């Protein structure tokens, strides 16, 4: 990233949630690597491991850990393996979310109990679990925990449904963790990108219309890019972000400030 050369040199970061080279997590990983960070990655299952391996190798990483964030034993094993390789962790990127695709369309009223619980567990509660396990590797020197959210957490977004509720919980967890961990020099923040063409976003009904609507109406007339989100992550994980914690940073072309669409487009 221009202007970011070396700002993360000497820092080690764990990236959780890279699905492919269009993932927001990958945009963050690439930017952090270009800024000098040494990276480790997690994935879930053999198929995602095969996708991740060439990406990890391209940024010089040979640390890949298979983990299921709904399984305590799996989390324990992954972080134990990481501690065997590294004696410290400077930043952790949590880019993990899931909801049943069949419930990311239609009425929120029809959300099932099972999918509500599963969406909250994977998309929100998992941040607490990974922060707890990262804590021993950060407590002596401080660090950064970073997650990803979306405007649907605070405003009704078509078809986002239970994910909006899960992201609202995630953002609240960011604030509580920031308060809890701040005295030990550990910062906790979230980036809220606008809609992006990722594997996760493709599961949401009508998402192409959402892309067009955001690009047409955002003050900057643009959607977020991997480069923009990556650059923001580098700032938050670097010493330049040393006094920023508990924040939700919007990277959405300014769309979040709007009260209504551009009237010229109505």
Predicted regions and their residues:
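Canonical Rossmann dinucleotide-binding motif of NAD(H)/NADP(H)-dependent dehydrogenases/reductases
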Residues: 5-41
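Hydrophobic structural elements of the Rossmann-like NAD(P)H-binding subdomain
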Residues: 15, 93, 146, 188-191, ...
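Catalytic loop of short-chain dehydrogenase/reductase
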Residues: 17-24, 97-128, 132, 139-183, ...
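A short hydrophobic alpha-helix cap/turn motif
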Residues: 33, 87, 138-140, 179-184, ...
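Conserved glycine-rich Rossmann-like NAD(P)H-binding loop of the short-chain dehydrogenase/reductase
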Residues: 37-52
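A glycine/serine/threonine-rich, flexible loop-to-helix segment
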Residues: 53, 162, 183, 193-218, ...
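Conserved mid-core segment of classical short-chain dehydrogenase/reductases
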Residues: 65-76, 80-85, 94-117, 136, ...
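C-terminal helical subdomain
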Residues: 125, 183, 190-193, 209-244, ...
């Amino acid at each position: 990233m221009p202007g970011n050369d070396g700002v993360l040199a000497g820092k080690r970061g764990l990236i959780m949630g890279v699905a492919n080279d269009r993932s927001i997590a990958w945009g963050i990983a690439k930017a952090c690597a270009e800024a000098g960070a040494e990276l480790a990655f997690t994935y879930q299952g053999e198929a995602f491991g095969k996708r991740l391996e060439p990406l990890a190798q391209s940024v010089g990483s040979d640390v890949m850990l298979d983990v299921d964030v709904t399984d305590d034993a799996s989390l324990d094993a992954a972080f134990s393996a990481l501690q065997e390789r590294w004696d410290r962790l400077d930043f952790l990127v949590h880019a993990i979310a899931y909801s049943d695709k069949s419930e990311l369309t239609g009425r929120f009223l029809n959300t099932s109990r099972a999918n509500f619980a599963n969406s909250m567990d994977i998309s929100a509660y998992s941040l607490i679990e990974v922060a707890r396990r990262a804590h021993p590797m950060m407590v002596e020197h401080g660090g950064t925990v970073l997650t990803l959210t979306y405007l649907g957490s605070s405003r009704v977004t078509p078809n986002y449904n239970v994910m909006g509720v899960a992201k609202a919980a995630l953002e609240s967890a960011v604030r509580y963790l920031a308060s809890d961990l701040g005295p030990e020099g550990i910062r906790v923040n979230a980036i809220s990108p606008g809609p992006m063409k990722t594997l996760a976003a493709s599961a949401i009904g009508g998402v192409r219309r959402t892309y067009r609507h955001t690009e047409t109406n955002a003050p900057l007339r643009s959607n977020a890019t991997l480069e923009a989100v990556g650059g923001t992550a580098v700032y938050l994980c670097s010493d330049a972000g040393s006094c920023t914690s508990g924040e939700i940073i919007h990277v959405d072309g300014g769309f979040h400030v709007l009260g209504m669409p551009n009237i010229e487009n109505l």
